[in-house]
Amino acid sequence: MQTPKNKLVIIPTYNEIENVERIIRAVSGLEGGYHILIIDDGSPDGTAAVVKSLQPEFEDRLFLIERSGKLGLGTAYITGFKWALDKGYDYVFEMDADFSHDPADLPRLLAACEDGGADFAIGSRYADGVSVVNWPIGRIIMSYYASVYTRTVLRTKIMDSTAGFLCYSRRVLEGIKIGRA
């Protein structure tokens, strides 16, 4: 039986007022009790206010870290990873707020780690053809060919190296020694 704090989805935001409530509801609606950590980089559009208004409804499952200014995606994930480790989560997910990743695929990523024995799983927008929403064609082409290039140069089987849709086991995050030189 899984512990209640088993799974955390980290969703960095900046000006995601149009998406943030929908993504929270989509992730919260999944079976398995996924917790959500929104890390907002001082969105001037009120993204953080929307999250705060939803916290009473999703008590003990929806968390918010507000940062002042646009500090970037990488530092948002590092902040989230540290928070997740401090709170005792076993599996930590990266996910965008703009629905470029389907929340319904979170259980598949989890299964790769939890049931499949992987310490790290990457979701792909290209494994079964292109699956992105509201992206300009230039961004789709650039992302696709960046992944092809990465597969070729590094000789890996990673289908979507720019996905940003990942699941990490606690063991991997602890091994990385996040935030240490």
Where would I find each of the regions flagged by the language model?
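Short, conserved active-site loop motifs that form the nucleotide-linked donor/cofactor pocket
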Residues: 7, 34, 61-63
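Acidic helix N-cap motif at the loop->helix transition within catalytic regions
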Residues: 18-22, 45-54
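Residue-level signature of catalytic and energy-coupling elements of molecular machines
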Residues: 20, 27, 80, 98, ...
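A conserved acidic beta->alpha catalytic loop
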Residues: 40-49, 99
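Short beta-strand/loop segment that forms part of the nucleotide-sugar
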Residues: 33-43, 65-66, 95
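Acceptor/aglycone-binding surface of glycosyltransferases and processive sugar-polymer synthases
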Residues: 67-86, 91, 103-180
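N-proximal low-complexity "stem/linker" segments adjacent to membrane-targeting elements
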Residues: 1-26
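Short, acidic, metal-binding catalytic loop of nucleotide-sugar glycosyltransferases
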Residues: 25-34
